[in-house]
Amino acid sequence: ESSAASDVYKRQAIKQASIVIMQLETPIESVTYAAKMAKKDGITVILNPAPAPTQQLPDDLLANVDILIPNVTEAEIISGMHITDDESAKEAIRYISSKGIKTVIITMGAKGALAYENNEFTHIPAFKVEAVDTTAAGDTFCGGLCVALSEGKNLKDAIIFASKASSISVTRMGAQVSIPLRKEIQ
C-alpha cells in the first residue's frame, strides 16, 4: 500500500473518533504522528505516558496532547521534578501544562487523582477498597475517563467515574479480567 493511501486511511480512521487515547508501548514517532493528525481535526487527544518514558517526551508530541494522565513516577520523569506531596505535584503539573497541555491528571493510587484544568486544581479522593492487584489500575482509569468524557461528563465527574472503575479493578486479580463491566460502575 502506498504511503499516500495509507495516510488517507489512517486519517479517515481518526476522523471517526471523538477521542484518541494513546500510550507509549507504540513507537514515539507513531504516537506523535497520530496526535498531530487528531489535533488537526479537532479531536481530543489523551496520552497515558506508560510505560514510564526513559527520556523527555518530544515537545511536538506534548503540544498536541489535550489531556495527559501520568502516574506519579511518569509525572516526575516528564517534569524532571521529585513529587513528595500535593505542593510538589502541583508544581510538576504546572510545568507539564506549560508544554501546551490544557488538562493534566496525575493518578496517585490510594491517594486519588490530582487534576489541573483552566488554571484550577481539583483533587478527587480514591475510593477505599482492599486492593489485591493493581496491574490494570491505570489502564482502567484511562478507559473509564474516555468513556465518561465521550458521554459528555465534565472533567470532575469523568474522574470520579474513572476512579470507581479503577477501584473495582484493583480488587480483582489479573489485567483484562479485572476491568469492570459498565453496570458495575454505576
Predicted regions and their residues:
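Generic structural signal for beta-strand residues in well-ordered domains
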Residues: 1, 13-14, 106
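Single conserved hydrophobic/aromatic residue that forms the stacking wall/gate
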Residues: 1-5, 9
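Conserved sugar-transfer catalytic core signal across GT-A, GT-B, and GT-C glycosyltransferases
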Residues: 4, 34, 130
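Conserved beta-alpha-beta core of the PfkB/ribokinase-like small-molecule kinase fold
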Residues: 12, 18-91, 112-113
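Conserved phosphate-binding/catalytic region of the ribokinase-like
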Residues: 40, 54-55, 59, 63, ...
